[in-house]
Design a protein with these regions (language model features):
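Extracellular/lumenal ectodomain signal focusing on beta-strand-rich modules
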Residues: 86-88, 100, 171
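Short, basic/glycine-rich phosphate-binding loops at helix/coil junctions
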Residues: 90-102
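Hydrophobic/anchoring residues in structured secondary elements
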Residues: 89-91, 174-177
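Short beta-strand element of the conserved SAM-dependent methyltransferase core
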Residues: 12, 101-104, 174
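Basic, often amphipathic N-terminal segments
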Residues: 1-85, 106-168, 181-201
Length: 201
């Protein structure tokens, strides 16, 4: 049985070097614009949180689904790390996509993203209702209610770190509302309940 309206998000988080660079960038923009600070991530999937989740059991089942290099079929069937190209900066009127790095997954990489969601759905089961997000892959750099001109100006004024032309995502993270909250509408209500290193891919 699920609790209607209690969401869960599944993130792909960058490897340590890119994570550090993106975290500094996010922190700088948050200080400049008064927005929240958050962990750099790409949203892989959204779920509905079942009642009385046994987190250690969920983590163990997901860990068992991590692809093992060299095992037949592992690259197609298991959870694995993924490297994506970025194609510049983007902006959107949505609070959580106000300013972001746009990703450019190839057809094969899109298939890999879809396969990762399928693995999650298969491991978690139907009660979680795991599904891909309705928005394009991206890594947010700032959240906020920005005017269009402000967003455009930020894109014009922001140099892109060449080290972020390609980003490897090597960790799966589960996020749910903290105790007492029922939505993920506020960053302050986010609680990371699971962090799982993925295969080398």
């Amino acid at each position: 049985m699920t609790v209607a309206g209690i969401p869960c998000a599944w993130w792909l988080v960058p490897e340590a070097g890119r994570h550090e660079r993106l975290s500094r960038w996010i922190g700088t923009l948050a200080a400049l614009h008064g927005g929240p600070v958050f962990e750099p991530h790409l949203t892989l999937a959204l779920s509905t949180l079942p009642e009385r989740v046994d987190v250690p059991d969920v983590r163990a089942r997901l860990a068992a689904a991590v692809a093992v290099p060299g095992r037949t079929g592992a690259a197609d069937e298991g959870l694995q790390s993924l490297t994506l190209n970025t194609v510049g900066l983007g902006h959107d009127p949505h609070f959580f996509r106000a300013f972001h790095l746009r990703m450019a997954p190839s057809q094969v990489e899109r298939q890999t993203l879809a396969a990762l969601v399928r693995v999650l759905h298969g491991v978690l089961g139907p009660a979680w209702d795991t599904r891909p997000p309705a928005f394009a892959p991206h890594v947010s750099l700032a959240y906020g209610e920005w005017t269009e001109e402000r967003r455009r100006q930020q894109v014009r004024d922001t140099p892109i770190d060449p080290e972020l032309a390609r980003i490897r995502f090597d960790t799966l993270v589960g996020v749910r509302p903290r105790a007492g909250a029922r939505t993920l509408d506020r960053v302050a209500d986010w609680e990371i309940f699971l962090r799982l290193p993925l295969s080398q891919g």
